[in-house]
Amino acid sequence: YYNTRVRKALRCCIAFFMLVGISVSFSCSVSSCGNSKTSEKQEQEEDLQAKKMIQGIWINEDQGSCAFRAKGDTIFYPDSLSEPVKFRIFADTLFLENSQSTKYHILKLTEHTLRFVNSDGDEVALSKTNDKDYLAVFEHEKPKTTDINQGRLIKRDTVMTAGEKRFHAYSQVNPTTFKVLRQSVNEEGVSVDQAYYDNIVHIAVYDGSKALINRDYRKGDFSRLVPKEYIARCILSDITIEKATAEGVHFIAILTEPDTYTSYHINIIVDANGKVNMTI
């Protein structure tokens, strides 16, 4: 009799916990659906009227300079290095989808006036212009040169001697379309992505007709000597031909972080047997 009562009690407990589990599962499902609907609702609540009003070219009222042009769902900057950015407006907030998304509180937006709070907490006042001459400000090309090698094909070759050895060394910087984005703040106090382009550098050394080295270098090839965090931010700017010694032919690879004073210089030595040694 005692065992029968225990078994009945156990069955009741099991049934109770099964009901609790079903209830929790159902509640989670309802909650999940609710969140999904809320997310969809938020997605639909973008202020399309505000987006329509912000279209056009905007001038900084204090400085008289061109701040940006909004066209469609994209903002374009007059600075040739600054990348165009997707934007959205929800309620009184402007969202910019940079590499690191940012948002700005809108104080006032009309057909011809925009006031918002920038990254420093300062109020920025802009006025829309209908002057078509400002369109030319946005019809620019990327600069051909900066403090780093950008968009330039650079070729070098030289003949060097070390003792009785005579070497023919080559170096060629090949531009690529691979972007390295660096976030900065423009004159209006708005975060913008500035785009720089990486390079691939080909080097070769010949002892007569024998190739000691003949290969491409990318910035990732130096990750053993340079921190990975820096590799992600830097450009392989150049590999220069330096000299020939008893050790071999010396090159220097220059890895530079755009818009900063930091760089790594890597010594590359190719010996008479084609062995490569790299040091900082």
Task: Identify what each model region corresponds to.
Residues N60-Y104, D193-Y197, H202-S209:
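N-terminal glycine/threonine-rich, aromatic-flanked beta-hairpin/loop signature
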Residues L225-D259:
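Acidic, glycine-rich flexible loop segments
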Residues S27-S32:
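C-terminal motif of bacterial Sec signal peptides marking the signal peptidase cleavage site
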